[in-house]
UniProtKB/Swiss-Prot annotation:
UniProt KW Membrane keyword: yes
One cellular-component annotation, GO: viral envelope
All ranges on the Intravirion side of the membrane: 668-686
Identification of the protein by name: Envelope glycoprotein H
Virion surface side: 25-646
Source organism (scientific name): Suid herpesvirus 1 (strain Rice)
Location of the region described as Interaction with gL in the Swiss-Prot/TrEMBL record: 157-217
Membrane topology reported for the UniProt record: Single-pass type I membrane protein
Amino acid sequence: MPASSVRLPLRLLTLAGLLALAGAAALARGAPQGGPPSPQGGPAPTAAPARGPTLFVLVGDGSAGFVFQLGGLGALNDTRIRGHLLGRYLVSYQVVPPPVSAWYFVQRPRERPRLSGPPSGAELVAFDAPGVRRTYTTAAVWPAEVAVLADAEARCPAAVFNVTLGEAFLGLRVALRSFLPLEVIISAERMRMIAPPALGAGLEPPGPPAGRFHVYTLGFLSDGAMHQTMRDVAAYVHESDDYLAQLSAAHAAALAAVVQPGPYYFYRAAVRLGVAAFVFSEAARRDRRASAPALLRVESDARLLSRLLMRAAGCPAGFAGLFDGRAERVPVAPADQLRAAWTFGEDPAPRLDLARATVAEAYRRSVRGKPFDQQALFFAVALLLRAGGPGDARETLLRTTAMCTAERAAAAAELTRAALSPAAAWNEPFSLLDVLSPCAVSLRRDLGGDATLANLGAAARLALAPAGAPGAAAATDEGAEEEEEDPVARAAPEIPAEALLALPLRGGASFVFTRRRPDCGPAYTLGGVDIANPLVLALVSNDSAACDYTDRMPESQHLPATDNPSVCVYCDCVFVRYSSAGTILETVLIESKDMEEQLMAGANSTIPSFNPTLHGGDVKALMLFPNGTVVDLLSFTSTRLAPVSPAYVVASVVGAAITVGILYALFKMLCSFSSEGYSRLINARS
């Protein structure tokens, strides 16, 4: 048979042609017939590294198939066979661990608590299975027909991450450039492996005993860590049928993959994410409906976590989408508008006002020590940094930097350690965004002594781009290795790398705190600070022609208090507290008249940062003005009482009136009793 004929599509090859090919292969030791047919289309499976002297190749058309067992690697030199070995119908059987006794099984997994309830309310959307079926192909398992619900892939030269969701089916492939691939299949039906004749027909791929689903893990047992990883991921789907518990575990696994780069963390996080999506799709498919907020949550988390994982592997890629546009058609609640805009890459212009209001409200609550929505803040910052003007971006970073206090950074570090603990109970939902926001999207770097938070911050800033934006989910061979621009650095390019903390001003300059004097800009050396940790405050800008190299000392002053209720004298100034140990304690942007009055109230202030009685004697204060002036703040010339609300005045008046009434009633009772008693006494004597 001519060599060119073997390159024809298999659907054109007849049964006689295949038999002729088998007879022409002198090295063939047998051609057992039967078995499932060859896949018709789909991506070519990647051949794994050869590990033995025997090759198995599957060829066939829609009606018949054959497995040829070739005697050795020398068969590759046969041009009549090479066309099939290098073609799309090659099936490599090198992923099955020899011997069979090396297959691994897991015990019953630890069940996780349920965090979400059944879908209810008016925000339900239909979730029906599609009528189109597709052939799912793999390297070691016979092809399966699957009704596909979702299909997503992130790919670059450094890594590939593919997820296929179907009716009671999950196919997941993960491969890294520097490590062996891993494949996980979850199916309600028993799968059959393409096995050597010696192992017999109908052999299941390796995996644990079947529970609600059959779980198969295919990969190379390269070392003990890989063996343990394959055992662990096989148990994920049976831990919980609650999508929110699985998503929480996926966020924790992604956190581990970002802060502890390595193939095993990457594999665990990828499988966690795939299993979370599978559990959600199965519940929605069975109910034929899904909660719109839940569908949006799964879609946005899949895009966010896939991007963070691929960034950890060295790729700027992430999932472009998961549920084939289903999520884009769901009604969006007002609280989820920023999440939806980020997820689908919508035109951000209609959402910019909402983003500004979200950042402002989070800042107001943060200054007063109240909790705020950290996830909404992340999406608001993402929109403002990417689509807002230069003023929006700089003002946003000024606020997030002020919100990033030492206490909040410590809380994020503690939350990270708890999430990374193997004993994490997941009694409540966990999201990576609760760790990332606001410190990871701020200009505060002096709290990054923990490498965990530093790695998270770098990953978070590169994940700020809208997930649906062009180029956010794909990478070419030429551009995959290029670093994506950091939107935080783009908003304030004048800030030097050694800055501990930066406060951007509207005019293109920034106040920066460093340990040594910057190359350009007027610098203030702060006195009374430990010489081992000196603090230098400088005003830097991109205008090199106006560079000022003067060294100064901040002037100590008693600033005048203002009595004008309609003019905010100190608005847009930044109040800073630092300690003699060289630590920046907090920064506060004065943005309103109310905050100005609280600042001048001194010990009567209800804002903790302004109240001097809450800080020790080694703590000093600075006032930074928008024009670049720096003042060592001693006090205000007069102490103003904190403003009293009208409700308090009304309550005080009512309380005083009630008190007077009670006293009057008591007085009348006493007088009446005395008068009546004397009258009786006089009458008795008479």
